[in-house]
Amino acid sequence: MKAAQKGFTLIELMIVVAIIGILAAIAIPAYQDYTARAQLSERMTLASGLKTKVSDIFSQDGSCPANTAATAGIEKDTDINGKYVAKVTTGGTAAASGGCTIVATMKASDVATPLRGKTLTLTLGNADKGSYTWACTSNADNKYLPKTCQTATTTTP
């Protein structure tokens, strides 16, 4: 009588290890991209929080507020920060069509490597046509940008 096999053969174990390796090779980069997008969402949230204030000031006196110091109800640029965002700066050159900018800058450390020091710029436009649009540009790779940053959004003054 033949004894029943107990355990796994070396080939079976090698196949399992190979499958785990393939799954890890797919999952790790996907998780890193997810983490980077989550970090960028903080930047978008902090920058978007200033759109109403900047729009209001532009509507009232046609100027673009600069927040290098606390002014016009907007905190100083380095006071507007987060876990991954170093600062959010407002400014720009006022024109009839807008021109005000909100620039959020990522920290140089403790952030996903492809995002270190990258900026997101929201630019006020279309002001001369009765409604404002905020165009979003960034020097970060497009795959990390939130969908709301990939198209202009309209707000009524």
Curated annotation (Swiss-Prot):
Cysteine-cysteine disulfides: 64-100, 136-149
Alphabetical keyword list: Disulfide bond, Fimbrium, Membrane, Methylation, Transmembrane, Transmembrane helix
Annotated source species: Pseudomonas aeruginosa
GO biological process, one term: type IV pilus-dependent motility
Subunit structure: The pili are polar flexible filaments of about 5.4 nanometers diameter and 2.5 micrometers average length; they consist of only a single polypeptide chain arranged in a helical configuration of five subunits per turn in the assembled pilus.
Designated name of the protein: Fimbrial protein
Topology within the bilayer: Single-pass membrane protein
Entry's transmembrane regions: 8-28
InterPro entries: N_methyl_site, Pilin, Pilin-like, T4P/T2SS_Core
Any one GO MF annotation of this record: glycosphingolipid binding
Residues carrying N-methylphenylalanine: 8
Chief localization: other
Propeptide: 1-7
Subcellular locations according to the entry: Fimbrium; Membrane
Superkingdom of source: Bacteria
NCBIfam families referenced in this protein's UniProt entry, alphabetically: IV_pilin_GFxxxE
Pfam families cross-referenced by the UniProt entry: N_methyl, Pilin
GO CC aspect terms: membrane; periplasmic space; type IV pilus
Family: Belongs to the N-Me-Phe pilin family.
UniProt key word Transferase: no
